[in-house]
């Protein structure tokens, strides 16, 4: 039986125990959080095991689920610690783990089979068949890519068995999650390891082919998206079949969690949204709001453009008069509030409205702030902080408990009995050996009994009714206290047991009846070899002429113009003529509404009879089987193979070659190659793709402002981004109008070819998609010469003339 259809879950973030309690109190149905290790918010406070144990206990008493993020790529040296960590999570009753790396899933299934597997948005699940693939591996839930439209979400929910989780509020990455290398290649901090430095929140200039900026200087935050806010679309998402509505924010403050979760609780319960709820969401931390992906209106309006930080709640405007600033408000604010002025040139000024300001009226202040005079749109950035920590004494989400004190008997002697009943009907009965006695003077009153039994401040219960036997009985406070404690313990145990049993009864059985194994394995008898990835016919010819023994063609074509389907026959013919291995690649991203069209391309690929097909998305296995493909399959970089267990997973599917993560060091690749039964291929030359985004800066700022009806200026000339340090990042677009941001430095590993081959890397790939054909031929021929010993490798030291090259992550690890 599937959990799908039984619940509608509001899923809250928690980066600290205080935030966790706020999420519980605000009405969350489930809470996701990270431990001190192995999670994608390494800079949050996060939870130690003891703290996590208490959090799980409290949540389960309230029938709230707890999901722990284990959503990063795992290195081989971490696997032993990871296994113990998952065992620890299992022992404390964690309901599910959120996973990116298939190695984590495989280990969890082996050592903690009761823990549910949830596929992270880092898995880039953007199609129904991606969800079905993860269903077949035992995942009970998949978090969809944030780039999907409502129509795509509806289609996926309707046809899958797994639960679907969708982000509805909070920060948004500009790159498809799980496919971003920008932070790690620029500064060594990887989003795939939970340490993203957020280069997308920095300013950039958009340059044309002449190197000239095409935008005003203050329009600089071209990669910084506004925050998601689907509050107006909750009913549509509910109707679509979404199970879990996820709020981003494990790094946010407790006030944010309390306000946003409480507001979404009201919206879900009332099945409508009111103006006060809109204002509540606007007053919390936000960079401005967008629904562009859900409504399929991707473009300029979804980006912050002039300010990537907290926008605040719009509350009026400022103007100047006789050397003073006037704050004209649409509503009153508290003294001590922080307001932000966004000026027309994009500059931002903050004022603290303290007692230095003159309150002309509830909605008008004037002052001479030291920060200077600023005129523009007025936003409420924050209100005075209440730093008081709230414990269970002040906690409001509690069970009402009725208690009945009575006298029990075993036939020989009497004893004291207490029955506690919750509004749900759950009841427990506890006993005490105390024999009720007739009071000599003053019997214990109902008020006294109520006082003792009502001392429930540090529990999740509150006393709503008390009943005691008729008669002048005396009930010592010590007996009443013991009965109260025992009843609370019994209720907590019963509630936790109910939650755990209900949760464990829920499972998903995938309905994909496919044998994923490749039908044929390609024999690489001539390794080592040089391969070339190209996306033009002239590039194919140049690479073959340079001596490449393998051509990888297609996939993410770095050109807006789509291929004619006949191109695949032509590439296969050219490769066959020269006895060169012909491999066709899939894109790194295929959205759900693109699947049917892409299958026509894939059909042409299959009919061209390549030697192999290299997949960047796991669901391609399903599509190839549907098309009757019986050839070899290879695993490429989009699959994020980061360790030996993940390698072995793909080997079991009879994959012929593996191209592991580009964030691995040479030492890590060597470890994988040592345990691999198939050739390992890695990129050694070319411009690495740093980002792939559904959003396109060219369409947004040079075209029409959105991808709809874009005149495709990218076809007429090239564009690039320039950062604060003067680095130039070329922009390329593909036939789906996606934006690909390339590295500013060209990878060049010619000096290390002998070392790479000695370390067990069998195939060295030149990525020539960003090169002219003549350069492709020259570079490929040099790698062939060095690999075969007919040409000497250049010096390893990078001189001043070679400062524009990079060694990637071969000798520089990631955080």
Task: Report each predicted region and the residues it spans.
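Active-site pocket-lining/capping segments in soluble small-molecule metabolic enzymes
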Residues: 2-125, 143-147, 151-244, 251-649, ...
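Short, conserved phosphate-binding/catalytic loop or strand-edge motifs used
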Residues: 129
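Long, basic N-terminal domains or extensions that often function
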Residues: 140
